[in-house]
Amino acid sequence: MLNEIKKDAQDRMDKCVEATKTQMAKVRTGRAHPSLLDSIKVPYYGSLTPLKQVGNVSIEDSRTLAISVFDSTMIPAVEKAIMSSDLGLNPMSAGATIRVPLPALTEERRKDLIKVVRAEAENGRIAVRNVRRDANSDVKALEKEKECTEDDVHRSEDEVQKFTDAHIKLIDEILAAKEAELMEV
């Protein structure tokens, strides 16, 4: 039972790290990256559809994304969805392709984005700590039910703490890489 609790805690912590990584990928840096447009939804036959389902998003050069829309009648809707997003992008259509140039980030905007990234990292750390708390309370519940000894409880808590430290270190590394990427001019 203790091994199941530890395995579950580790799996949930891995998911927290992945979620943090995904959230940070949405933050725009100076470079073009297809995941930048993942959060954009386009109205398609009455329902909001993710952009990647109505077209291919590719990198044209370091500061430009190219979107090849499958249905050419969708081009105006895709452009409008990109413009109305909070990314501050201005798409231009060229035939069946939509080009999205990424403007250079100002120093002030970089600092704002670093604050956003740090907040996302802190949310990830909090999620990992919540998993630790849940795992430790599950272990203590087992002790109360006399299914494990006090030594087992302390050993399990130590292992869960090691998982927690490792996952928080991973989040800190992701944060450091993203901050370095944001500060590149």
Curated annotation (Swiss-Prot):
One of its GO terms (molecular function) is ribosomal large subunit binding. One of its GO terms (biological process) is cytoplasmic translational termination. Its main location: cytoplasm. GO terms for cellular component: cytosol. It is found in: Cytoplasm. InterPro entries: Ribosome_recyc_fac, Ribosome_recyc_fac_dom, RRF_sf. SUPFAM superfamilies: Ribosome recycling factor, RRF (SSF55194). It comes from the Bacteria. CDD domains: RRF. Keywords: Cytoplasm, Protein biosynthesis. Belongs to the RRF family. NCBIfam families: frr. HAMAP family: RRF. Responsible for the release of ribosomes from messenger RNA at the termination of protein biosynthesis. May increase the efficiency of translation by recycling ribosomes from one round of translation to another. This is Ribosome-recycling factor. It comes from Shewanella woodyi (strain ATCC 51908 / MS32).
